[in-house]
Amino acid sequence: MGQVLPLVTRQGDRIAIVSGLRTPFARQATAFHGIPAVDLGKMVVGELLARSEIPAEVIEQLVFGQVVQMPEAPNIAREIVLGTGMNVHTDAYSVSRACATSFQAVANVAESLMAGTIRAGIAGGADSSSVLPIGVSKKLARVLVDFNKARIMRQRLKLFSRLRLRDLMPVPPAVAEYSTGLRMGDTAEQMAKTYGITREQQDALAHRSHQRAAQAWSDGKLKEEVMTAFIPPYKQPLVEDNNIRGNSSLADYAKLRPAFDRKHGTVTAANSTPLTDGAAAVILMTESRAKELGLVPLGYLRSYAFTAIDVWQDMLLGPAWSTPLALERAGLTMSDLTLIDMHEAFAAQTLANIQLLGSERFARDVLGRAHATGEVDDSKFNVLGGSIAYGHPFAATGARMITQTLHELRRRGGGFGLVTACAAGGLGAAMVLEAE
């Protein structure tokens, strides 16, 4: 066991997570069509504060993330402060770590708490796949800049005469890695082939995810942590996530064609997480501050770890790399965990990470560790379903997982929970949570 790194303030206070909330998650171009991420962020933070009844001046910092950023609101965190009635003096800044963005936001607030610069803060993220920054071609962008510099009309007309029809076509946001040109689905396909993960295994995991998420909603387990969203024109509120397929059968998954490798692939739209809109946030504070305010924390942040690996192959193995670090820093092993919640970007990626967490060879030859991190107990794993069912608003997923895991730990009488995710750019994140 390596060095344990306790997450405590200088006064010995633990980092308490006192509350968490999210919007329902909606598939792209459905219930939240036309609602930008900044408005989703305002929606969830405003409701989170209202439900917590914490005075606005208690919150000293807000760290928020958005992966698909809009040029008109580059600092989503500050816009949320200004748009929710929070104290205008609240420090606010934005972060981005791809799919692990709200993990990063939580870590940043925790570090401020440990440094003693604040005693309470909010962390979270929001993304919209329905309101996208549609760009212009590089040639048109250059002409537009030169157009503003030109002094006479003749110069301006000459600039536009250089353009061709193709230069005027809108440019959608990139879906591939900037450094490699590979789509995440391409990497998921590569990992499925490398680690021998079959189409049947992927479909079975996806089906399990939807079944468990549907059951969680049916049992009322998500009611406290998901707000009702009222959206223009205010005719039909969104109460639940609208991606969950509660009535599907395993045979339904087999009907879909591969989405990336059309000839020989196994990754489909059904065993991958969909493009999604939504927001999520949590309130963190020092343990003593929570006691002063008479608040009972949902739980505590025990440890966290971020890792980075190569992007050309196995880019989505973040959980297999970050989990042993987070456990080591918490002074725990896999067997100590009550719950494990892993982000399901793709069923193939999820199954590959599960496989390698239990691999002695991977631990020895790749991680340089003496023993495997540990086998993943299916009875502890994604017990309420995962991102394949709920959806994945990139910057919101981490805060969803943290809130969901803490609530489930409390229902089970406490214990330790691991939340972990892969992210674009070969990044990985893992956090160990504790509930009493």
UniProtKB/Swiss-Prot annotation:
Keyword Cytoplasm applies: yes
What InterPro entries has UniProt attached to this entry? Answer: Ac-CoA_C-AcTrfase_FadI (IPR012806), Thiolase (IPR002155), Thiolase-like (IPR016039), Thiolase_acyl_enz_int_AS (IPR020615), Thiolase_AS (IPR020610), Thiolase_C (IPR020617), Thiolase_CS (IPR020613), Thiolase_N (IPR020616)
Enumerate the subcellular locations listed in this protein's record, separating them with semicolons: Cytoplasm
Q: What is its main location?
A: cytoplasm
Q: Report if keyword Iron is assigned.
A: no
Which UniProt keyword terms apply here?
Acyltransferase, Cytoplasm, Fatty acid metabolism, Lipid degradation, Lipid metabolism, Transferase
Question: What is its quaternary makeup?
Answer: Heterotetramer of two alpha chains (FadJ) and two beta chains (FadI).
The record ties this protein, via NCBIfam families, to: AcCoA-C-Actrans, FadI, PRK08963.1
Its protein name is 3-ketoacyl-CoA thiolase
